């Protein structure tokens, strides 16, 4: 009986204890492999994310390492601005979505813009220096004439141009009723007023204004008869057309003379 119990006990112990060991081994191996699987999956996810941020399967720009901006954009060094803009827009559309390609294209385009700006600036400086040199080398009478000329602000030019253009239009509108004597008088008074503001001398302003009116009237009386008659309205008299030339002289004298 005891032997049977011993045998049964050994059987019981073997049936419960022996199988439990491999189960523990299997579980431990599974639990030990799980972190490595998670790490590998996360690594693949990060790798895919990085690839997608830098373009992934998007075509890449093949000239990213080309130093010359003209060669990088595929244009000639003598290309115009329109051609450079067209090349830049075409390349950005072709390689859109790839960050490094877009940065390379934009970098080359910005270099060309800066070089164009510097070249224009140098051209303007050289032009000013050449003009200044020519003025210094000009004869004395030309220097004295240039001393009487100045360049006012653009808003002043436009305001006075509008005033004398209005006087000319008013004279044309009233050409059927009478001559432009009143409009000419108003224009002369405005010219003298503007010159007096500038020179602070009423006598000098009157002298320049009357001289401009006489010069304009004289030039108009010489130029107008040379114009073919089919270009002139029948109601436009010689006096009216001469006054229009005089308005131009009055505008120039009160705007650019000092």
From Swiss-Prot:
What does gene deletion cause? Reduced chloroplast biogenesis and chlorophyll synthesis associated with less POR protein accumulation. Photobleaching and growth inhibition of plants under light conditions. In dark-grown plants, reduced POR accumulation in etioplasts and impaired formation of prolamellar bodies, subsequently affecting chloroplast biogenesis upon illumination. Embryo lethal with arrested embryogenesis at the globular stage.
Residues carrying N-acetylthreonine: 49
Question: Which keywords label this protein?
Answer: Acetylation, Chaperone, Chloroplast, Developmental protein, Membrane, Mitochondrion, Plastid, Thylakoid, Transit peptide, Transmembrane, Transmembrane helix
Membrane topology per record: Multi-pass membrane protein
As annotated in Swiss-Prot or TrEMBL, what is the tissue specificity of this protein?
Answer: Expressed ubiquitously with higher levels in young leaves, flowers, and the root elongation zone.
Which residues does the annotated region (J-like domain required for holdase chaperone activity) include?
A: 67-122
Might you name a Gene Ontology BP term for this protein? chloroplast organization
Where does the UniProt annotation locate this protein? Mitochondrion membrane; Plastid, Chloroplast envelope; Plastid, Chloroplast thylakoid membrane
- Which residues does the Swiss-Prot or TrEMBL entry list as transit peptide? 1-48
The record ties this protein, via InterPro entries, to: CPP1-like (IPR021788)
MF terms from GO for this chain are: protein folding chaperone
Q: Which GO cellular component terms are attached?
A: chloroplast; chloroplast envelope; chloroplast inner membrane; chloroplast stroma; chloroplast thylakoid; chloroplast thylakoid membrane; mitochondrial membrane; mitochondrion
Spans traversing the lipid bilayer: 162-182, 207-227, 237-257
> Which residues are in coiled coils?
none
What the protein does?
Essential protein required during embryogenesis. Exhibits holdase chaperone activity involved in the stabilization of NADPH:protochlorophyllide oxidoreductase (POR) proteins against photooxidative stress during POR proteins import into chloroplasts. Required for chloroplast biogenesis and development. When expressed in yeast, triggers mitochondria-mediated cell death associated with the loss of mitochondrial membrane potential.
What family does the entry list?
A: Belongs to the chaperone-like protein of POR1 protein family.
Quaternary data: Interacts with PORB in chloroplast. Interacts with PORA during plastid import.
Name of the protein in its database record:
Protein CHAPERONE-LIKE PROTEIN OF POR1, chloroplastic
Q: Which gene codes for it?
A: CPP1
């Amino acid at each position: 009986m005891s032997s049977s119990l011993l045998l049964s006990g050994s059987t019981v112990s073997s049936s419960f204890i022996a199988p439990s060991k491999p189960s523990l081994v299997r579980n431990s191996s599974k639990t030990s492999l799980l972190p490595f699987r998670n790490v590998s999956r996360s690594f693949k996810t990060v790798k895919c994310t990085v690839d997608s941020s830098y373009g992934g399967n998007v075509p890449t720009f093949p000239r990213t390492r080309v130093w010359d901006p003209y060669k990088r954009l595929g244009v000639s060094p003598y290309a115009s601005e329109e051609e450079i803009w067209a090349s830049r827009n075409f390349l950005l559309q072709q390689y859109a979505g790839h960050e490094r390609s877009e940065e390379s294209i934009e970098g080359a385009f910005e270099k060309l813009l800066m070089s164009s700006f510097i070249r224009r600036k140098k051209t303007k400086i050289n032009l000013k220096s050449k003009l200044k040199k020519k003025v210094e080398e000009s004869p004395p009478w030309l220097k004295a004439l240039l001393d009487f000329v100045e360049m006012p602000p653009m808003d002043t030019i436009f305001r006075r141009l509008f005033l004398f253009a209005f006087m000319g239009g008013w004279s044309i509108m009233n050409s059927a009723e009478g001559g432009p004597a009143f409009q000419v008088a108003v224009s002369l008074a405005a010219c003298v007023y503007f010159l007096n503001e500038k020179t602070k001398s009423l006598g000098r302003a009157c002298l320049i204004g009357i001289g401009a009116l006489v010069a304009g009237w004289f030039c108009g009386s010489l130029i107008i008869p040379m114009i073919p008659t089919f270009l002139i309205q029948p109601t436009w008299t010689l006096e009216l057309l001469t006054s229009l030339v005089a308005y131009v002289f009055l505008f120039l004298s009160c705007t650019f003379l000092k």
